[in-house]
A protein has these predicted regions:
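Expand to "…catalyze enediolate/carbanion chemistry for C-C bond making/breaking, isomerization
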Residues: 1-110
Length: 110
């Protein structure tokens, strides 16, 4: 896995620039975003039809770039988070975390 460019930029006090991906599971998307200067992408599984297979494919295509990949999972559930991390995602964004227990479940799953 390539180093997390988002983490590096943040540590240097720079502001990473990125995109949220809601549609289009084509192999050209990572290259387009790289040429556009993106430092990171958030793949949204909460508000679209991306399933885990689509998302894993996108993550693998982004690994050919220096773009850090984060995924907004549909819910805080171990199977979603573990699969994203196992696929090579750099991190997850979890929706509707409303308690310390939910936040801890998220950390435990990662």
């Amino acid at each position: 896995m390539k180093p997390n460019s988002f983490k590096k930029l943040y540590a240097e006090g720079k502001v990473p620039v990125g995109h949220m991906l809601f549609e289009f599971t084509t192999r050209g998307i990572p290259e387009i975003l790289e040429v556009a200067g993106s430092d990171f992408v958030v793949i949204d599984m909460e508000h679209n039809a991306f399933n885990i297979a689509d998302t894993a494919d996108l993550i693998s295509w982004f690994r050919a770039t220096d773009i850090a990949v984060f995924v907004r999972v549909p819910e805080v559930h171990y199977s979603h988070i573990a699969r994203i991390m196992d696929s090579g995602g750099h991190g997850v964004m979890a929706p509707n975390v409303k308690s310390v227990e939910q936040a801890q479940a998220l950390v435990d799953a990662a």
